[in-house]
Amino acid sequence: LTKSVIYAIFLIDFSPARGVFLIQKNKSSSLQADSTVVPGAERRIPLLHGTDDPFSCVSESLQLVEENLVRAVRSRELDLTRIASHLIDSGGKRVRPMVTLLAYFAFGGQRTQDIVDIATAIELIHTATLLHDDIIDGAETRRGKESAFKKFGLKSTLVTGDFLFIKAFEFAGKFDETVVQWTADACTLLTEGEILQGHFNRNRAVTVEDYLEIVKRKTASLFHTGAKVGAYLAGAHSSLVDEAESYGLNMGIAFQMVDDILDVVGHIDLLGKPIGMDLRDGNPALPIILSVIDGDPATIGAFENGKPTEAQINAALDSIKTGSSIQEAKSLSKRYAREALKAVKKLPPSMYRNGLKSLVQLIIDRDF
């Protein structure tokens, strides 16, 4: 895949740190990481120049994940298969399993089927949360198609989400207690993040610190769990498992920040959903929070209104675009991206490490 094609794919299909960074504008958008390696981290890992994009690095393993997903959703109750397949077949770039696979191979992992199975579990959990999120939000579309909730109804979609959680642990349950516990912990964080987000729905008192806590749990949990499990199963030293976790955590936060920005400045044809959905739903997204903190009346009015009109939403979006919130949000997303890259530099050189670096860059470089 060429770089431009990869960017286009991310634009079409992307819809989910330790401490709080200060928001500041960066003089350069370049994200760099040097090639320093922690002593003792060197393993026999193949170097393959010219294939640094994350897709080609793990394309064969991702195909195995796809095959697992198809098998996983088969059921005697055809409605379960039909509803799950409706979302699984609608696309998505499988970023969470990609992180898991890249981390595993970057640390010298050799047992492909093992990591494919846990990557499948993580994607099944993510898919389950999407089904449940669409119910919570009353979403009519998902990935450019009618949402499962809209097409099949609340009850069947809810049960299908539960079904996918169960299937996820059929895969995760094959591993040792540590992996199972980390996977369960990720599910706990997801649910906590959803509840915490609800506390700040249409609440102008929400802060950036509150937002980060939501994102760490709701979005970043599967990213950092996938990276951590990948490193652990590859046999990495505990200090390097921590670095992998830091990579996933910071990348997941940056990912959500960019997603929030695109909800304001993106295009429906590329996003597969209307822009301004966070304002419509009252979600505490980063550009909205920053605009509310700045005291913008249009944003405050639309955010606090239980049923904002399209005119109110459009006025708020225009105000956010012309204010400083988008630039501040971009700056903060790049700050977290750089933290992810700091963790990557501790890995031994390989195409997989390069893939992890490129994945961060692709997320940050999505066109605004």
Predicted regions and their residues:
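All-alpha prenyltransferase/terpene-synthase fold signal
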Residues: 2-368
